[in-house]
């Protein structure tokens, strides 16, 4: 219901909490689904101010590599940069650059003593790739000292018109590297969600049971910011035991657990040590849990119940599922959630890992539930507590389908957050924290829902933030 307001949409702040310790610039989390979130989605969403949760339908090593890819995509100062020896060949240098997706390498000897730098420009016109790096590297290198501040380092880059500044200690040993590319990213993405070292935030999913701790250990080693104990039924012994075990072993790591749909479930997860809880049993567009099992709670009811309990422990809630329009995000936040997790809305973007398909002249991307037969066979059986079941004995709780292609993720996020800001303006809420205080819900009938949508007109041009239900 609209309120008296003195808040313009552009004045609304979207900053919020993901967990007790992690803050985001926007309340958007991408789902840990194998057709939604891998490194590319996580990088793009973190640059917009949200966070991506890398799915676990892959090996432990690959998931850790995906996390590292996000963490290394940008940083204020690169600590322990990748290096090469002067006797290495140009072929080896090119291979290292390609493997790490970088454009230059400091050249070091012995105990990381800096003797030069080689970049892709040095290699561009070289035809003899067996030539040693020492023959083409730049030997007179401009450097910064270990005590050089970030602003001083940026000034050195500008003064000497260089793109890379190695940072060395008093003995000339390489300790860090600053690049113009990372500085440029900071200007291009001022609202990016980053850790204290200037790296993008990223989360990763873990399951329950035997492999959970091993997977969590590898992810923590890869510098993951938050672990998500990701199951369909969070209020169960296996999940609660896993949360306790993860928190006990990795005390400094933030843990989100779910999914639950009742206050009792939320309380159990919080008491087990969760730093954030995920709410939603069956509201997702590709989820069939409520129909197959007969169990679930309508999402608004579940959120109101769980948020009431979570508020007593000051534990953030993430509303997972049921988000079709930006207005649904506003409703979830008005219930007391501090973030929303979306899958369908991002599955059609360029960055999503789903396969591109063409159907009847239109472009789509594959989108499947983690409870679909195909996803369960690929590794998500334990999410539905069927990890011991044979592939031909699985009981699915989701479907595989397709969603319209949507282009870059940034455009989708812009429209979603624009809708949220407008909703906050209607309610007179300057911050997300104020939304539950300002919001008042009314129950509508099917006739009211029909009236809410476009009616009595044929759409001739589709807007970027609305599609006919």
List where the protein language model places each region.
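Bateman/CBS regulatory modules and CBS-like beta-alpha motifs in cytosolic regions of diverse proteins
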Residues: 8, 12-24, 31-33, 62-100, ...
């Amino acid at each position: 219901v609209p309120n008296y307001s003195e808040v313009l949409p552009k004045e609304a702040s979207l900053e919020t909490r993901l967990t007790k310790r992690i803050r985001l610039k926007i309340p958007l989390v991408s789902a840990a689904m194998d057709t939604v979130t891998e490194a590319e989605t996580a990088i793009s969403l973190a640059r917009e101010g949200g966070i991506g949760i890398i799915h676990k339908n892959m090996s432990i090593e690959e998931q850790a590599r995906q996390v590292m890819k996000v963490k290394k995509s940008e940083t204020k100062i690169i600590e322990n940069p990748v290096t090469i020896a002067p006797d290495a060949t140009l072929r080896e240098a090119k291979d290292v650059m390609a493997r790490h997706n970088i454009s230059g390498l400091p050249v070091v000897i012995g105990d990381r003593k800096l003797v030069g730098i080689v970049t892709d420009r040095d290699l561009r016109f070289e035809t003899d790739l067996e030539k040693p790096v020492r023959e083409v590297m730049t030997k007179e290198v401009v450097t910064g000292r270990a005590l050089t501040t970030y602003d001083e380092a940026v000034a050195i880059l500008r003064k000497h018109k260089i793109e890379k500044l190695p940072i060395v200690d008093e003995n000339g040993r390489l300790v860090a590297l600053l690049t113009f590319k990372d500085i440029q990213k900071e200007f291009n993405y001022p609202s990016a969600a980053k850790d204290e070292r200037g790296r993008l935030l990223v989360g990763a999913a873990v399951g329950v049971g035997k492999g959970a701790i091993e997977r969590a250990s590898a992810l923590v080693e890869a510098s993951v910011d938050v672990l998500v104990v990701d199951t369909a039924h969070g209020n169960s012994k296996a999940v609660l035991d896993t949360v306790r075990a993860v928190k006990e072993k990795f005390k400094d790591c933030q843990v989100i657990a779910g999914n639950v749909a009742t206050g009792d479930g939320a309380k159990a997860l919080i008491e087990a040590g969760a730093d954030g809880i995920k709410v939603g049993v069956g509201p997702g567009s590709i989820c069939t849990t409520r129909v197959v099992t007969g169990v679930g709670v309508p999402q608004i009811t579940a959120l109101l119940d769980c948020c009431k309990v979570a508020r007593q422990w000051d534990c953030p809630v993430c509303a997972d599922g049921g988000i079709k329009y930006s207005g649904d995000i506003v409703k979830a936040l008005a219930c007391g959630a501090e973030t929303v997790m979306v899958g369908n809305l991002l599955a059609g973007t360029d960055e999503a890992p789903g396969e591109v398909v063409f159907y009847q002249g239109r472009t789509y991307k594959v989108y499947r539930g983690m409870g679909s037969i195909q996803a369960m066979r690929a590794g998500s059986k334990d999410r539905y507590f069927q990890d011991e079941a044979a592939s031909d004995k699985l009981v699915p709780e989701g479907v595989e389908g397709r969603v319209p292609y949507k282009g870059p993720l940034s455009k989708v996020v812009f429209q979603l957050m624009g809708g949220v800001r407008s909703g906050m303006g209607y309610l007179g809420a300057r911050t997300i924290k104020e939304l539950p205080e300002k919001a008042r819900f009314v129950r509508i009938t099917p006739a009211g829902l029909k009236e809410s949508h476009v009616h009595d007109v044929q759409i001739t041009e589709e807007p970027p933030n609305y599609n006919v239900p």
